[in-house]
Design a protein with these regions (language model features):
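Conserved non-cysteine loop/helix-boundary elements of the Radical SAM core domain that shape
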Residues: 1-64, 75-89
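Short, ordered loop/turn segments at secondary-structure junctions
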Residues: 70
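Terminal RNA-binding accessory module
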Residues: 80-168
């Protein structure tokens, strides 16, 4: 939920950045696309801690993230901690985090050499939408109804936020 050793301690998390990194590198080297949760703006997240977290984040082979900004909940230990982070600062940090992971995801998709295995889930504006084995979105132009089908794609274009293909 964070990539700063100090922040994990403040958040009372048991995982460790270096052991997490080793695990993620191992899984990534075996062809897995990886994602994680990340809490932005938790009390105590100083500028120094944020800088360390972003430096560490660049080292992680992540392709997806479920990021959210901390929201105070009465009755929790975090709610009474000093150094609450202002919303505008948390928003800037959130956007920085999303940009880093979006870039990592784009590079992952650009460098992928495996055929995509895609489950087509819906059709929108005449295009079929599905997710591949790496949980990346793929938009397919097809004259054939593909909803509910598994398709295998090896010729596709990598766009900023998705892959695009034509099914013949």
């Amino acid at each position: 939920q964070h990539t700063s050793k100090e922040m994990l301690k403040i958040m009372n998390r048991r995982n460790k950045v270096l052991s997490d990194l080793e695990l993620f590198e191992f899984l990534s080297s075996n062809g897995y696309a990886l994602g994680t949760d990340f809490i932005v703006g938790h009390p105590g997240e100083t500028e120094q801690i944020w800088k360390e977290a972003m430096e560490n984040l660049h080292r992680f082979p992540l392709t997806h993230i479920h990021a959210f900004t901390y929201s105070k909940r009465d009755g929790t230990p975090s709610a009474i901690m000093k150094h609450q982070i202002k919303g505008d600062i948390a928003k800037v940090r959130y956007n920085e985090l999303i940009k880093i992971i979006d870039d990592k995801n784009y590079n992952f998709r650009k460098n992928n050499t495996q055929k995509l295995e895609v489950l087509i889930e819906s059709v929108k504006n005449g295009k079929y939408i599905g997710f591949d084995q790496f949980f990346n979105s793929l938009e397919i132009d097809s004259p054939v109804d593909l909803v509910g089908d598994w398709v295998f794609i090896d010729d596709y274009e990598v766009k900023a936020d998705k892959n695009v293909a034509r099914f013949k």
